[in-house]
UniProtKB/Swiss-Prot annotation:
Any matching Pfam family: Aa_trans
InterPro entries: AA_transpt_TM (IPR013057)
Location relative to the cell: Membrane
Main location: membrane
Compositionally biased region (Polar residues): 84-99
Recorded topology in the membrane: Multi-pass membrane protein
Residue numbers spanned by region Disordered: 1-99
Species name: Arabidopsis thaliana (Mouse-ear cress)
Domain of life: Eukaryota
TM segment ranges: 164-184, 189-209, 236-256, 264-286, 308-328, 345-365, 375-395, 424-444, 459-479, 481-501, 521-541
Name of encoding gene: AVT1D
Descriptive protein name: Amino acid transporter AVT1D
GO biological process: amino acid transport
UniProt record similarity statement: Belongs to the amino acid/polyamine transporter 2 family. Amino acid/auxin permease (AAAP) (TC 2.A.18.5) subfamily.
Keyword line: Amino-acid transport, Membrane, Transmembrane, Transmembrane helix, Transport
Amino acid sequence: MKLDEEFLHDRDHSFLTDDEENQAALACSDDEHDGDDDGRRGGENSDSSSPLSRDRSDNNLSDVSNPPWPQSYRQSMDLLTGMTPPSVSFMPQSSSRRLASSFQKKQQSSFCDSLSSSSSKPLLSQPVPDKEETILPVNPQSQLKLSVTDLPLPEPNLCSFSQSVLNGTNVLCGLGLITMPYAIKESGWLGLPILLFFGVITCYTGVLMKRCLESSPGIQTYPDIGQAAFGITGRFIISILLYVELYAACVEYIIMMSDNLSGLFPNVSLSIASGISLDSPQIFAILTTLLVLPTVWLKDLSLLSYLSVGGVLASILLGICLFWVGAVDGIGFHATGRVFDLSNLPVTIGIFGFGYSGHSVFPNIYSSMKDPSRFPLVLVICFSFCTVLYIAVAVCGYTMFGEAVESQFTLNMPKHFFPSKVAVWTAVITPMTKYALTITPIVMSLEELIPTAKMRSRGVSILFRTMLVTSTLVVALSVPFFAIVAALIGSFLAMLVALIFPCLCYLSILKGKLSNTQIGLCIFIIVFGVVSGCCGTYSAISRLANQMTD
């Protein structure tokens, strides 16, 4: 039975969502109530000093059967980064609880003690079970039937240092890369130091999030950080911002795929009998949406989860193709362009923010590491690599195409060159593999809000997902301006997610433990984020309005 106990102990330190931890704690709370009152009281006393316990008491979160929304955040975001493919799963909750019921009372107490070591400070308080509930005596025969000592146990799905670097780089090197030359065209060459500055401060805010995670073992995700800092309201606000950011990324995927396909096939058009005509970008937007729709219906996203990790290779391939076209295929590099353009700087800042906004999954990467103490080094490597790649692509693209550079540099590359075709198809295929993974966290969070189990049937789920995907198509057709949408996302959402809220949460959770230098630096980043966000959002909305009226 020792192996069974170790398995349950491993499960405790593995990827558990908030509701799973509380259900596991509930399975052993009877024994705590009967024989471990002193230990439980001690845990409560130690709990009372943590930010999370204060948050619990302030918000009266005492019903473990109704934990705060979203419960599925960690699981769904792990799929997005490829850290925890859905095919690699642990024993279902019901099986774990049945197995726990077969243990002797002493073994249950041991499991509860180990659970309290890391989960005694969850975001949700644990209810005291009814005194009438008792643990039935153990039947040796049933114990033999339920024993899993002869079965191979899954290893804890923790990431090595190199895997964590790969996951972090995959999150950062995404849609922002393809529009970096356009961003430098808007701001001029002095935009490059600003890009470097953004890389430094966003890396620093990632380290601040790590310190928030270290403050209590119950904090495991970005919404958890928000709840620890500002209660349930903070959890809801941050969750909504993160899901809106993911939704906007799905819209950008459709725009990106349709723009590149229409560049390959510009003469495609369709006229409907009712007098409606569709041009090439509109046709390919609809077509690519139909192609990704079946992937959103899937329940098992294992293959897509593994393929999405190839996003790092795709980003490197795009940079190599761009350089090859300029150096080998005769386009050449020309040292021209403006030095600085203040009027367009807010748009550039928004795009830079869009390129560095990976903070939604940083807590997941930290929690999944075998050695979390090396997380700051992971961030430094990821941000350094992405910054170097961003600068290289921005310089190559701007010197190759000058003021004619478009919102996506793949649209400028001559289509008759083989590297150009490789780059364009890479820009088409990569979003196809990431679309379902990006929209799945939104789907899972919204499905949590469905009131009855009868409404959560497979057919209703497919209909719901189809409607959500269709809505991203409608938005993409309404605002088919890749760079402007990227600037809007970066100015409004990324400034909040990557700059403002990490600092605010850090100041709140570690209040009274920070030096004046740390407080001053956080205030500076907050002010910078607010000013940049307001200016960039206004500029992006103004451009969007002008484009819509043209």
